[in-house]
């Protein structure tokens, strides 16, 4: 413990002329400094009392009522920072009342000063601050005069309201409102008044010794490292790492943030926070000078500091995190002073836990920390997530999530079908945002488009949603450059409401049961957005001038009994919104054929607009990734070409051996960049069976069917039809005692492309004219065996069957039955 006095490594006495009579007092003060501890959190902007009082705040054990700006000295000591022992010029300091024209405090010249400090009276390990300073500090131990090296007074050198680069690397001003609270939590040993050895750097002057005690700010130095770094420290204010973190062996720089100028006047505080925030978050709550209205005392101890260091990883002690900026009161009332009190540990002598306004269960990890009137100056913000007091519905309705607008939905499902009864016109001039409306979308034959929902029998009305979608070869989605526009007026008969879903305007139209769920769309126009506004969006790749076709997309949501929602969607034909494109680009509205065999050669008539004599029709097959696999130009008949119609010969497909239909596209081209939208076309396989339709006089009967039951005579009856294959199901044939087969076998069914005349010889249509075995003039005897000598059937032959005499028919049946079975 005596190494402090014996170590002369950083003794600067040989550099400066000190009074040798004060060396003893300086040594005694250094001894007392090791047992002194200055508290934090005390603002230096307290009101200044005029009378020289004593130290009224009590201290327990090693606790002292001192501010971050610590000044050692007595009120009656004649020497101070205002006077220099070297006889330097005193004109560098402005008068106490001097201020600059803009209201800021007067600038004062910086200087280098070395000051020795004395400790307080130590008696049995306790400090008594409630005695007069004159009694505590005897004459031999009073603070010596300060050795001052004054520099020239440069007005533009440094503003006292700003920190110098040599003082701190912190980006906050010492007088800013945002940093006033953290400035008051500066380390005591960071002040030039409490450091045993000073850093030889230029730093602004702090409070005079004789000004510290009248303000009730006692001076103590922290029990810590005996030496300070001679270099600057990255920060002097308390942050999360320094206030709650472990104490390092090398304290911060002796330079500190101060709230008083060299002339003794209180510095002006900016009402706004510092424009450059600190790179480290700090537990500040932006307490201004007005909120510190009296002496504030903090009780600390070494045990509490050790406990805080051990729990420094807990974030629940962040004082400023729970107070948002907008939660602060705008009008500060003069309420009791703020006090952040820390209970001393149980082993502290004479420790009395102060009263607390908060129950200890609010801070379980830190029950020894008490809050005084800390939240009196701010709106009440609870520490835990705010429980909304808004009453909730006793039976909350969980609305199912509706599909997004870019989802591909069917137009019919089950008994429901959403259908466009009247298609819109192929061209509509969209209006810009800067011009008036151009009216609602019209239909081709006059009037307006209409939409109807079929299969809905409920009495509840539904909502029909309408938005503008794309009309290119990609998947249907909301159009980026066009929006729906609500049309109102005396001529509009349909009510509507405009909504926005995912940055897309949606027009909501009611579907009423009294109107058969039908709506006339006379309230929808098309609005053109500016290309520059859309093309600059993030992720937008479309170009507005090349994407001028749209579709009217209708969507309806039908609630189901099981709580689900059925969504149907249907899109209209493409609508050209550009006037120039409508006059130049070809448009296909209708095609006479939708499919053809792969051999091609079939003619197709296209109906639309802007067809020319040299218009070309190109068939294209695309890969799943969009690349063209096959392209073929079809032949057009120039003699039959008209501006609104075009005759084209379908080309053969590239693969003649396909086994399933293949869907391709085609478009009409009037030039290099004048193409129509892609139209769909389907190629069918070429090996589809084709059956001749010419009748024949001698029909070969089909193979007989085997018996179906052991109790019956194996007598069977043939089914007239083409000899295709043996039916797999024996019950499909006419058997004695059984009605005729209701349908044909799957093997014997003709292809879909066959002529409807070929069903005359089939089993199913032929059986329609039979009511039973008696239809052929055969009666069933008692034994269940057919007889061939029965009378002919009274009715005439089947209209579609060949003209066969009943007698010849029965004879052929008997002859066939007498032949041996294979």
From Swiss-Prot:
Segments of the chain annotated as binding DNA: 429-436
Compositional bias segments (type: Polar residues): 192-206, 808-822
Any GO BP annotation: positive regulation of transcription by RNA polymerase II
Record's GO cellular component terms: cytoplasm; nucleus; transcription regulator complex
Region (Disordered) residue spans: 192-289, 772-822
Modified positions (Phosphoserine) in chain numbering: 225, 229, 237, 286
Domain remark from Swiss-Prot or TrEMBL: Rel Similarity Domain (RSD) allows DNA-binding and cooperative interactions with AP1 factors. The N-terminal transactivation domain (TAD-A) binds to and is activated by Cbp/p300. The dephosphorylated form contains two unmasked nuclear localization signals (NLS), which allow translocation of the protein to the nucleus.
Protein name: Nuclear factor of activated T-cells, cytoplasmic 1
Species this chain originates from: Sus scrofa (Pig)
